[in-house]
Amino acid sequence: MCRTLAAFPTTCLERAKEFKTRLGIFLHKSELGSDPASVGKFEWGSKHSKDGRNFSEDVLGWRESFDLLLSSKNGVAAFHTFLKTEFSEENLEFWLACEEFKKLRSATKLASRAHRIFEEFIRSEAPKEVNLDHETRELTRTNLQAATATCFDVAQGKTRTLMEKDSYPRFLKSPAYRDLAAQAASASPSSGSPAEPSHT
C-alpha cells in the first residue's frame, strides 16, 4: 500500500493519476465497452446499470452502500482501479473469483476451480495472497477436500468485510471519486445536489 509518497515517488503518483483519469473516462463515455483497454478485464459497463439507472445515478449510488457498489459493473471496475493504486486489488479479485465459482454446477469443474482459487489467493505465499487468519486459511483448505459451491464462503466473507471497512471508505473519500460524484450529481436530472443522498 502507498503509505508515503516518498516510499514510492513515481509508482503511487502515476497510479493515482491513472485512477482519476479512468474514472473521468467512465463519466464521459457512457458506453464503456468502446474502450476495453481502459480497465482491463473488469470493464463490463454500459450506459445503464442492470436496474435501469443511468450512469450518473449509478456513480452516485456507489456511496449509498458497499452492496450497491459491488452490484454495479462500473462500480466494480472503478473500485478495482482504485485498489490497484493501493496495491490491494487481490481482495476484490478473490471476491469476484468466488462469485464466479459459486455459479459452477459441475462437480468436476468445482473441484478444479477451487484448487486454482486456493493456489492463487489462499495458500501461504500465493501470487495474490489475501489477508486471512490462520484458522480461516486452514478451514478453507479442509473444505477443498470435498469442494462445494460454499467452500470459500467464510474466506470470501472476511475479505468482503475487510474491503467494506477499510478500502471502501477510502475509495469514497478519494479526490478522484469525489470529483466524479460531483460531476455525476450535476449531470443527473434527479439529483439536486452532490450532498449525501436523501432517505425520504
Curated annotation (Swiss-Prot):
CDD domains associated with the record: RGS_RGS16
Subcellular localization: Membrane
Membrane topology: Lipid-anchor
InterPro entries: RGS, RGS_sf, RGS_subdom1/3, RGS_subdomain_2
Annotated SMART domains: RGS
Broad class of the protein's primary localization: membrane
Annotated Pfam families: RGS (PF00615)
Any one GO molecular-function label of the UniProt entry: GTPase activator activity
Residue stretches making up the RGS domain: 65-181
PTM statement from Swiss-Prot or TrEMBL: Palmitoylated on Cys-2 and/or Cys-12. Phosphorylated. Phosphorylation at Tyr-168 by EGFR enhances GTPase accelerating (GAP) activity toward GNAI1.
Lipidation, S-palmitoyl cysteine type: 2, 12
Parts forming coiled coils: none
Keyword Transit peptide among record annotations: no
PTM annotation (Phosphotyrosine): residues: 168, 177
GO biological process terms, semicolon-separated: G protein-coupled receptor signaling pathway; negative regulation of signal transduction
Top-level taxonomic group: Eukaryota
GO cellular component: cytoplasm; membrane
Family annotation (PROSITE patterns): RGS
Physiological role: Regulates G protein-coupled receptor signaling cascades. Inhibits signal transduction by increasing the GTPase activity of G protein alpha subunits, thereby driving them into their inactive GDP-bound form. Plays an important role in the phototransduction cascade by regulating the lifetime and effective concentration of activated transducin alpha. May regulate extra and intracellular mitogenic signals. (Microbial infection) Gets inactivated and/or degraded by porcine circovirus 2 ORF3 protein, leading to enhanced expression of IL-6 and IL-8 in infected lymphocytes. This would explain chronic inflammatory response of PCV2 infected pigs.
Subunit architecture: Interacts with GNAI1 and GNAQ. Interacts with GNAI3, GNAI3 and GNAO1. (Microbial infection) Interacts with porcine circovirus 2 ORF3 protein.
Name by which UniProt lists this protein: Regulator of G-protein signaling 16
